[in-house]
């Protein structure tokens, strides 16, 4: 019955934890994850007491992009100083590349998947309390990754970024904040943010009406 099913789930999960801990201990000690030819470095700080359900995880993506490595390294270090949550793990990854689109290339998805799984297993993160944020080039990444990886996050916050070619359709069930200054005219970010909100609302209404008519 359900009791045996639950017991089997617990056994399988515990075996999975043991396997991951044996395979990935070094990458957590070194704070770097490599998949293929891309390496994601990261650092994190822990705040507050751990709740019974596990810690919150805040993944905060730095700005920069399209610049020499030392510039993006500086942006990464600066990102570590920006927020201090009352509870949870504040984690800042260092983008694997220094390109303008450093946070929304295809290699980011599997790297973030592995990072989140590692933090759940090694640092007792609650998988239902994983949050994504970023500003400038990091904001670009939030625009892109939140719809693509919406099942991984409890909420996402975009600051001063540009959506580029992304679609908001994956955000229907994901709380999503846009923070762009009224006078932030670089790359037309202020006007594009308004357009993105309007498009999202329009898509939401269409999907809601479709669900009503087909139910």
Report each predicted region and the residues it spans:
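Active-site machinery of serine-nucleophile hydrolases
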Residues: 55-121
């Amino acid at each position: 019955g359900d009791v045996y099913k639950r017991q089997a789930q617990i056994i399988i999960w515990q075996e999975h934890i043991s396997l991951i801990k044996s395979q990935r201990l070094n990458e957590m000690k070194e704070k770097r994850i490599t998949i293929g030819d891309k390496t994601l470095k990261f650092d994190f700080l822990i705040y507050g007491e751990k709740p019974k359900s596990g810690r919150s995880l805040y993944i905060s993506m730095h700005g920069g992009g399209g610049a020499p490595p030392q510039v993006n390294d500086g942006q990464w270090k600066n990102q570590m100083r920006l927020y201090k949550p009352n509870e949870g793990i504040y984690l800042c990854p260092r983008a694997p590349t220094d390109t303008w689109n450093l946070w929304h290339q295809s290699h980011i998805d599997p790297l973030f998947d592995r990072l989140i799984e590692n933090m759940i297993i090694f640092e007792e993160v609650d998988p239902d309390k994983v949050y994504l944020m970023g500003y400038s080039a990091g904001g670009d990444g939030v625009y892109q990754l939140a719809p693509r990886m919406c099942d991984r996050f409890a909420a996402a916050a975009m600051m001063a970024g540009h959506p580029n070619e992304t679609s908001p359709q994956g955000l229907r069930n994901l709380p999503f904040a846009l923070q762009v200054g009224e006078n932030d005219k670089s790359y037309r970010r202020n006007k594009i943010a308004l357009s993105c909100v309007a498009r999202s609302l329009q898509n939401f209404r269409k999907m809601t009406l479709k669900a009503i008519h087909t139910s």
